[in-house]
Design a protein with these regions (language model features):
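Sequence context surrounding c-type heme c attachment/ligation sites in exported
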Residues: 24-37, 43, 47-56, 60, ...
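Positively charged n-region of N-terminal signal peptides that target proteins for export
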Residues: 1-5
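Ligand-binding pocket segment of bilobal, Venus flytrap-like solute-binding proteins
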Residues: 80
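Short acidic/polar alpha-helix capping motifs at helix-coil junctions
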Residues: 42-44, 71-72
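Bacterial Sec-dependent signal peptides at the C-terminal "C-region" and cleavage site
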Residues: 16-26
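Bacterial N-terminal signal peptides
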Residues: 6-16
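Short, structured beta-strand/loop micro-motifs enriched in basic residues and often containing a Trp
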Residues: 67-77
Length: 185
């Protein structure tokens, strides 16, 4: 009897340890660690090192060309490929830079120069913050500008954020076609 109890305890300890190690090894991040009790979102300070690169956009605009780099919390692409949706707690960070260019031997080359803004989204399948105007349509929405990179400045996702995402409504408000890692290995 003691042998069986010891075996059960050993098995439980092993499984708990295995799950913890698995979580640690895939670097899964709970996006709600970035959210306070009122639903205020902070920008993750280490997203360039810990998050996956989803994709890059070049936006050529007469008002100012931009480079958009989008990162996702670890495990996002794998989960999306398996389920066709973003997991609850997924974090997306879009870092927007200005763009510079020069004539090089190969052509007119362009590159990112000077961060302008960061957009941070946290997937919320449970509608946790229904009274917060920065939460809705399945996401928490936040905007941070270069002049105060730790200060969230959006006031209402319907006024400040979702307008740019309307063409992507059918894909959970995200332009997934720009992120091939979500659909291919």
């Amino acid at each position: 009897m003691i042998g069986r109890i010891s075996f059960v305890i050993f098995t439980l300890v092993f499984l708990v340890g295995y799950q913890a190690a698995k979580s640690q090894s895939n670097g899964s991040i709970n996006g709600f660690e970035l959210v306070d009790k009122a639903g205020n979102i902070r920008k993750p300070s280490d997203f360039r090192n810990r998050y996956e690169a989803l994709g890059t956009y070049a936006v050529l605009d007469p008002k100012g060309n931009q480079m958009h780099f989008t990162y996702a919390s670890p495990g996002t692409a794998e989960y999306y490929r398996e389920h066709g949706t973003f997991a609850d707690g997924t974090v997306l960070v879009k870092e927007v830079f200005g763009m510079d260019h020069a004539q090089m031997t190969t052509s007119d080359a362009h590159w990112a120069s000077g961060a302008k803004v960061w957009f941070v989204l946290v997937k919320d399948q449970k509608q946790r913050f229904g009274n917060n105007p920065l939460w809705g349509d399945g996401w928490g929405w936040a905007l941070f500008k270069a002049d105060a990179p730790d200060k969230q400045v959006a006031t209402d996702y319907k006024k400040d954020c979702v307008g740019c995402h309307i063409p992507a409504k059918s894909t959970d408000w995200i332009y997934v076609r720009g992120y091939p890692v979500l659909t291919s290995r």
